[in-house]
Design a protein with these regions (language model features):
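Flexible, glycine/charged-enriched surface loops at secondary-structure junctions
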Residues: 62, 140-148
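Short, glycine- and charge-enriched coil/turn segments that flank and shape catalytic ligand pockets
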Residues: 36, 121-123, 142
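C-terminal cap of metal-dependent C-N hydrolases
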Residues: 70-127
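Conserved NTP-handling cores and scaffolds of large molecular machines
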Residues: 26-29, 137, 141
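C-terminal regulatory/interaction regions
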Residues: 124-128, 132, 145-178
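Generic recognition of well-ordered alpha-helical segments
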Residues: 21-24, 51, 101, 107-108, ...
Length: 178
């Protein structure tokens, strides 16, 4: 069974990106089995491209660079430290890169990142607006924290009770079977 990777959401972490998703795919099996397995850097790249496209029913449109496909691609600057000296595209992309080397991104052939900067958004204006809104955001977040404090104990208790129910498998990654 193939594993598809994607990272087009913010519910996991504001810093999530496809490079970190590929790295985690390679590293997580190591916490459950000390023996090398089938998940390596080349497979992680496949999971993030071809398998990801297939999983969402778009393998005829995206996931590969060939005629007739959408021109969705990322160009990396190989002069960045993650790629010096260059020796393995797959290993260096998966285990060394975190996004710093992204120079250009094309979506449907249209540039959305140029020279490492967003081409579709005024980054300076966005940063200024975020700074302007930050005090109100912090105030609202603090008010929510205070308001929700009374919910913490009942929610934790409900969660603990739910975890007592057997699902027929161990929920914890890394715990060796006894």
């Amino acid at each position: 069974m193939d594993i598809a990777l994607g990272c087009d959401n913010y519910s996991c972490a504001e810093t999530q990106n496809i490079f970190l998703a590929m790295r985690m795919l390679c590293l997580l099996p190591a916490v459950t089995d000390p023996e090398p397995g089938p998940v390596n850097a080349a497979y992680a790249l496949k999971a993030a491209t071809l398998v990801g496209a297939r999983a969402v029913g778009l393998s005829d449109k995206i996931g590969a660079l060939k005629p007739g496909m959408a021109a969705d691609l990322m160009i990396l600057d190989l002069k960045e430290p993650a790629f010096v000296p260059f020796n393995s595209a797959a290993r260096q992309i998966v285990f060394s890169e975190a996004g710093r080397a992204v120079d250009t991104v094309l979506v449907g052939g249209r540039p959305v990142v140029r020279n490492g900067k967003l081409a579709t958004v005024d980054e300076a204006a966005l940063a200024a607006e975020a700074e302007e809104l930050a005090p109100a955001f912090r105030r609202d977040a603090q008010a929510l924290t205070v308001r929700n404090a009374e919910l913490i104990t009942p929610l934790l208790n409900a969660n603990r009770e739910a975890w007592k129910v057997s699902l027929g498998f161990d929920r914890y990654i890394g715990r060796r079977p006894s």
